[in-house]
Structures are given as structure tokens and as C-alpha cells.
Amino acid sequence: MSQEIYDYANQLERAVRALPEYQKVLEVKEAIQADASASELFDEFVAMQEKIQEMMQSGQMPTAEEQTSIQELSQKIEANDQLKAYFEAQQALSVYMSDIERIVFAPLKDLVK
């Protein structure tokens, strides 16, 4: 039985990769990588996201200046069709991932009830 669960997990991994929503994220990501300005903006977003996560993990909040930078970056992203499409595709994929997470972790939640 223990090997069987890994088989199911691998099957799920392949099924996620086959989802049209996953394929759309890949497609849009490739388009971003092919566009220098979109790629630079995406890299800036990733760096900002990592910085914010580090701050929050250490109990810090973004300064007013950093919040302004975040808002400016958000506006640039909204104005870029490729990045906007990427985040929309990510959102569509995240619906599946949230549902899968809920299903997979249901037995563990039952253990703490």
C-alpha cells in the first residue's frame, strides 16, 4: 500500500502538468521570458515578493516608502498585458491547487478534530 500512494502522487503530478490552466501558465511565462521589459518587471516582482516575505517572517512591516514601491510595481504589472495574463493564469491554476490541497490534507485535519 505504501508504494501505491506514491504512484497516486506521481499520477496527480502528471495530471496537474496536463491541465490546460498549467499549460497556459507555461505559455505565458515563455512569452514573458521572450520580452526583455516584461522579464525585467517579472524579476523585479519576484525580488519584491521575496523581500516582503523575509520581512514578514522576521515580524517587520514594509515602510511607507516600500509600500509606495509595491503599489508602483503593481501598477506597472497591471499595465503589462503579458504579466497580467500570467497572474490571471496563475489564479486559475491556484483554484485547482487549493482544491487538491483541501482533498489531500482532509485526512490529516481529521486527526486533530
Curated annotation (Swiss-Prot):
UniProt-recorded name of the protein: UPF0342 protein MGAS10750_Spy0713
InterPro entries: Com_YlbF (IPR010368), YheA/YmcA-like_dom_sf (IPR023378)
Lineage per the UniProt record: Bacteria, Bacillati, Bacillota, Bacilli, Lactobacillales
Stored SUPFAM superfamilies: YheA/YmcA-like (SSF158622)
Highest taxon above the source species: Bacteria
NCBIfam families: PRK13676.1-1
Organism: Streptococcus pyogenes serotype M4 (strain MGAS10750)
Family, similarity comment: Belongs to the UPF0342 family.
